[in-house]
């Protein structure tokens, strides 16, 4: 049943005009009155008409080991900004760092802004990072990230299938010994790409040899250093490798 302003007025004892002004954050309503009206409105399940005025692009940062060097993310950000502009929305960009002392306050402000819709870049998010975002008062779209526990509208890359197609290509070219260069920071996307790698290797009956798996850093410099150490220590190498992402492959 739809909750009306008149119903809130009857329960709180304030006039419908006062209730309407409070719910729309207009001047002239004191803090105590506004707090009481919002409390009753929430208890009754009142939902205001949503008026989104801007897109807030939120870049979640755990350690920067993926997003700082990625050539993929700037293109994604540019695409979101372009599409938002074509629809008449301003795009506001902000970074939230889970290691920042102000992190909780920052996301609290972001998720209580009902005039903005949030596009959350979740590349570096782990499962334990999602819970605070379930309390958002505004709309959220999760980009390049997902939770196994909580529901979010999401836009994702098909990580498992993409990795499988890459390994199928190598197998189709006749490679029997295929190695895997994996990032040492195991974001969700990497774990699902690993599933795709193993799935195709098993399907083709190809061995997954521990000595053919190289674990390296996820930045170009650290990937290079890690791969150099691996090659120095590994006398026999496969004829081809699958890498978790382009940054690691370049390194």
Q: Model-predicted segments: where are they?
A:
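Alpha-helical recognition/docking segments in bacterial nutrient-uptake
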Residues: 54-168, 172, 230-232, 236
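Periplasmic-binding protein-like
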Residues: 115-122, 179-181, 213, 234-248
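Short glycine/serine/threonine/alanine-rich loop segments
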Residues: 14, 46, 88-89, 138, ...
């Amino acid at each position: 049943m739809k909750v009306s302003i008149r119903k809130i007025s009857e329960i709180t004892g304030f006039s419908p005009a006062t209730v309407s002004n409070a719910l729309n954050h207009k001047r002239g309503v004191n803090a105590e009155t506004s707090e009481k009206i919002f409390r009753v409105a929430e208890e009754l399940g009142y939902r205001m008409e949503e008026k989104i005025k801007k897109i807030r692009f939120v870049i979640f940062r755990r350690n920067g080991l993926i997003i700082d060097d990625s050539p993929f993310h700037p293109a994604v950000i540019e695409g979101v900004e372009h599409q938002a502009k074509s629809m008449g929305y301003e795009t506001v960009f902000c970074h939230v760092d889970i290691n920042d002392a102000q992190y909780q306050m920052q996301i609290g402000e972001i998720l209580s802004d009902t005039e903005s819709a949030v596009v959350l870049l979740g590349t570096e998010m782990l499962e334990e990072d999602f819970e605070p975002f379930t309390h958002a008062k505004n709309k959220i779209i999760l980009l390049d990230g997902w939770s196994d526990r909580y529901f979010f509208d999401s836009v994702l890359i098909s990580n498992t299938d993409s990795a499988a197609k890459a390994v199928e290509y190598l197998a189709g070219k006749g490679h029997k010994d295929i190695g895997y260069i994996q990032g040492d920071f195991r974001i969700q996307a990497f774990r699902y790409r690993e599933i795709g790698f193993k799935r195709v290797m098993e399907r083709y009956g190809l061995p997954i040899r521990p000595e053919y798996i190289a674990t390296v850093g996820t930045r170009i410099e650290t990937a290079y250093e890690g791969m150099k150490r691996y090659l120095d220590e590994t006398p026999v190498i496969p004829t081809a490798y699958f890498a978790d992402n382009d940054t690691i492959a370049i390194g």
